[in-house]
Amino acid sequence: MYQDIIRSELNEAADTLNKFLSDEANIAAIQRAAVLLADAFKAGGKVLSCGNGGSHCDAMHFAEELTGRYRENRPGYPAIAISDVSHLSCVSNDFGYDYVFSRYVEAVGKAGDVLLGLSTSGNSANIIKAVEAARAQGMKVIALTGKDGGKMDGLADVEIRVPHFGYADRIQEIHIKVIHILMLLIEKEMVK
């Protein structure tokens, strides 16, 4: 009954992945991001991650696999997803939702740390403000974006962009794959 829809969805996902994979700049950006993160950990830094909606879940997934584990047992790496409900509700109420991540970055981030900001459109005001706060703190920035990069285009040290202009879920599917590859590469880089 739904077989055509299922095939269509999987084919669209495969097409999105293949388009992303065909651009060597994406491969190079993933490698640069992994090395940047590992170098920060080796120097005593940490990573803060943030996103909205499904991207918020991806930011949490990213931090969890750094502090917990990916495929192999190893020491945890310092990572914090900006997801504390009391912080988010306090800042939303007192300052506005645009500041929920930047206030945390200002309080906790320091030079030598990295911010991973996820926005499928590249236009999320609260992610952009977090990037600005990270820059003010002397942090490095990695952005996972989509479409044409939106307003985040050019703001990060490393941008990994999924050039898909349809629904955001296709972009998120590539983002989670990128996150898993980052885990694998960070683990390899940390034992060099």
From Swiss-Prot:
Binding positions for Zn(2+) per the UniProt entry: 61, 65, 172, 180
Pathway: Carbohydrate biosynthesis; D-glycero-D-manno-heptose 7-phosphate biosynthesis; D-glycero-alpha-D-manno-heptose 7-phosphate and D-glycero-beta-D-manno-heptose 7-phosphate from sedoheptulose 7-phosphate: step 1/1
Keywords: Carbohydrate metabolism, Cytoplasm, Isomerase, Metal-binding, Zinc
Enzyme Commission number(s) of this protein: 5.3.1.28
A GO term from the CC aspect: cytoplasm
Sequence similarity: Belongs to the SIS family. GmhA subfamily.
Name of this chain's protein: Phosphoheptose isomerase
InterPro entries from the UniProt entry: GmhA/DiaA, Phosphoheptose_Isoase, SIS_dom, SIS_dom_sf, SIS_GmhA/DiaA_subfam
PROSITE patterns: SIS
Binding site for substrate: 52-54, 65, 93-94, 119-121, 124, 172
Assembly notes: Homotetramer.
GO biological process annotation, one example: carbohydrate metabolic process
Tree of life domain: Bacteria
Catalytic function, reaction form: 2 D-sedoheptulose 7-phosphate = D-glycero-alpha-D-manno-heptose 7-phosphate + D-glycero-beta-D-manno-heptose 7-phosphate
Details of cofactor binding: Binds 1 zinc ion per subunit.
Matching NCBIfam families: gmhA (TIGR00441), PRK00414.1 (NF001628)
Record-annotated disulphide pairs: none
Reported function: Catalyzes the isomerization of sedoheptulose 7-phosphate in D-glycero-D-manno-heptose 7-phosphate.
Subcellular location: Cytoplasm
Gene3D superfamilies linked: Glucose-6-phosphate isomerase like protein, domain 1
Comment field (misc): The reaction produces a racemic mixture of D-glycero-alpha-D-manno-heptose 7-phosphate and D-glycero-beta-D-manno-heptose 7-phosphate.
